[in-house]
């Protein structure tokens, strides 16, 4: 039996939409899952918030808790003025959270285990910071790279460090989510193949597979925790970065 833990991340083309100069634009399994995740979130929130009552039901309670959780996060990270970004942070958190959790279901596709997806989300965040920062503050936004109280002879080096740090944000933001989801799913797949391989050896094989099986259960629980934490970390860092667009001064 051949173990290919990378096969689960393979992009499959469903429909070719466009071909220009040898470059093909297709509707893939990744795109299908992204559309499905957005549709699932939309229908859940629509159903949960319809006919809102003073005493909320279970689904309304989940929606309200999610709202309050993200709203508190944004206020603490970017202040009251930062609430203008609440829709963005809430959408990113819910999207990453649902994508991570759905990716744990067998025979599904983990879109956040693809660097192109996480990089697009990270660039959306940093692009929003830059565009809103210049829109709101003009050239004063550049004060983000000039800390106050720095001696003049050190200023060029500090500015260079600040610029490099800012440019590294989308890289670290995308790689963190991508690497955690990729590594965890590969580990689960390897252990699963190991259990199946031992089980095919008969009774003694199944006895030997007992420990790896429980390790799979533990790894699955850990992966669920990681899926939730990574969505939380992504949202927290997004809020912190957006604070620079609201308050660019050090």
From Swiss-Prot:
Places the protein is found: Cell inner membrane
Membrane topology: Multi-pass membrane protein
A GO CC term attached to the entry: proton-transporting ATP synthase complex
Keyword field: ATP synthesis, Cell inner membrane, Cell membrane, CF(0), Hydrogen ion transport, Ion transport, Membrane, Transmembrane, Transmembrane helix, Transport
Alphabetized Pfam families for the sequence: ATP-synt_A
Source taxon at top rank: Bacteria
UniProt-listed PROSITE patterns: ATPASE_A
Disulphide bonds in the chain: none
Cited HAMAP family: ATP_synth_a_bact
Family to which this protein belongs: Belongs to the ATPase A chain family.
Protein function: Key component of the proton channel; it plays a direct role in the translocation of protons across the membrane.
Name by which UniProt lists this protein: ATP synthase subunit a
